[in-house]
Amino acid sequence: MSRWTHRTFFIALSAIVTTAGFGSSGCAHGNSSTSESAVPSTFPGISSSITAPPATGLPAPEVLTNVLSRLADPNIPGIDKLPLIESATPDSAVTLDKFSNALRDNGYLPMTFTANNIAWSNKNPSDVLATISVNIAQTNNSVFSFPMEFTPFPPPQQSWQLSKRTADMLLEFGNSSGLTNPAPIKAPTPTPSH
């Protein structure tokens, strides 16, 4: 991975930390009770978007870290990784291959993951947020953590995949190459001295 790609990888990770940090702050779950009243619980034209988390339990940490380990593994073809990411298309396979190959080529592998603080998402109640600690092979900055979001596979499967939002930030699926060149830095224009 070239220097700009290395930089882009860490910028994407920083974006995940910032976005997830802002997205998860200030959430509280209150107890709801059922009571009959003459006053409607919602006013006409206003819908409630609050939904209870699923009746199933939170996923085990190793279920989530297995998703990430498989995504980082360059021995698994990108096309076989598509089920690991919500709404991934066959076009995403190239990006997944580039991502895992770049990790390998730049000495990040082996890479291990630990999932902590697993909780239901406050944006999508069926999704979960987890703080993921990443341990990379390089000795400098070898461990870092950031929040990631996971979504359940569509039924009948009982497993999890990386949410589209997290994958977009981490892997830059919006870009056809999967990697972004940073904008060229322009030298400041000298101002004439008087």
Curated annotation (Swiss-Prot):
Location in the cell: Cell membrane
Superkingdom to which the source organism belongs: Bacteria
Span list, region Disordered: 174-194
Main localisation: membrane
Annotated Pro residues bias: 185-194
Nucleotidyltransferase is among the record's keywords: no
Keyword list, A-Z: Cell membrane, Lipoprotein, Membrane, Palmitate, Signal
Parts of the chain that traverse the membrane: none
Range of residues in the leader sequence: 1-26
GO cellular component: plasma membrane
Annotated membrane topology: Lipid-anchor
Keyword Cytoplasm appears in the UniProt entry: no
Lipidation residue positions, type N-palmitoyl cysteine: C27
Lipidation (S-diacylglycerol cysteine): C27
Family from the record: Belongs to the MTB12 family.
Protein's name according to its UniProt entry: Putative lipoprotein LppK
Organism from which the protein derives: Mycobacterium leprae (strain TN)
Gene: lppK
